[in-house]
């Protein structure tokens, strides 16, 4: 899976 799953970005 992509690393983006490791952190959450605020809109």
Curated annotation (Swiss-Prot):
GO terms for biological process: neuropeptide signaling pathway. It is found in: Secreted. The keyword Endoplasmic reticulum does not apply. Keywords: Neuropeptide, Secreted. The keyword Phosphoprotein does not apply. FMRFamides and FMRFamide-like peptides are neuropeptides. This is Extended FMRFamide-10.
